[in-house]
Design a protein with these regions (language model features):
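Macromolecular interaction modules
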Residues: 1-248
Length: 248
């Protein structure tokens, strides 16, 4: 059975005080995340704060990838990921219909720019870096997660070839990589996603962005041709560090 992942990107309201922001994060980590983890069929929960990448990634994001003009949530400051035994665990009951404990709705209404999607794991590879606590745990200390569509059906096939023949085998050997999961959209705007896990933001920058992601700027490379066919969600790819469970 393929693992499911429920992703929620969001911001907190502009002008919120640092005290109010910390109160929301404390509640999220002390109450909401443990509540989600206790739901039947939910296997892990991980919360990330956006940090951004280096200059090469910023150039890729502004010049190489397409951006949707669809009216979808533009939040990108935080990303909450929930793992499930399968994607269907997020539909029985549906995450849209779930009756939450008293006070939860008021807290969660503080989120703005909300964008939600459910994915199923299409394919995955483990990298050379070990997980913190062995198999079955949530994603690593640092992640990069893109969410996107392709412009044409033919570019869908090229995307599949690229991940199967090049990208996933490459990530399986990359220093600092814990795992990579290619995801297929089940619900939400994004039809595709990819979740890269790294031991640290520094390892991601040194071993992935600077020598590899920057190749998307070279129009003679396969990477550039594939990425030119993508239409990304606002802020995608999300790059951030885990804030819950806390790093050890």
């Amino acid at each position: 059975m393929a693992e499911g992942i429920w992703a929620t990107w969001y911001d907190l309201a502009q002008g919120v005080t640092s005290e109010a922001r910390q109160q929301f994060l404390d509640w999220t980590h002390e109450v909401y995340c443990p509540y989600l983890r206790a739901q039947p069929g939910y296997t892990w929960v991980a919360h990330y704060r956006h940090t951004g990448g280096g200059p090469q990634m910023e150039k890729v994001k502004t010049t190489a990838v397409g951006r949707t003009q669809d009216a979808i949530g533009s939040g990108n400051d935080y990303l909450l990921l929930v793992g499930g035994l399968s994607a269907h665990n997020f539909f029985k009951p549906s995450i849209k219909d779930a009756v939450l404990p008293e006070g939860f709705d008021a807290r969660l209404s503080q989120r703005t720019g909300l964008r939600t999607a459910v994915f199923t794991v299409e394919a995955s590879v483990n990298g050379p870096a070990p997980r913190e606590h062995g198999p079955g745990t949530g994603p690593g200390p640092a992640i990069q997660m893109g969410s996107f569509r392709m412009r044409t059906p033919e570019e869908e096939f090229d995307l599949g070839r690229w991940y199967a023949q090049y990208r996933l085998p490459f990530m399986a050997q990359l220093t600092g990589c814990i795992a990579t999961r290619k995801l297929a959209g089940v619900a939400g705007w994004a039809k595709h996603s990819v979740l890269y896990e790294f031991t640290s933001l520094e390892a991601r920058l040194k071993h992935f962005e600077e020598p590899h992601e920057a190749l998307a700027l070279d129009r003679t490379r396969w990477e550039s041709q594939v990425i030119a066919g993508t239409v990304h969600a606002p802020g995608s790819p999300f790059i951030g560090e885990r804030i819950w469970p806390p790093l050890e």
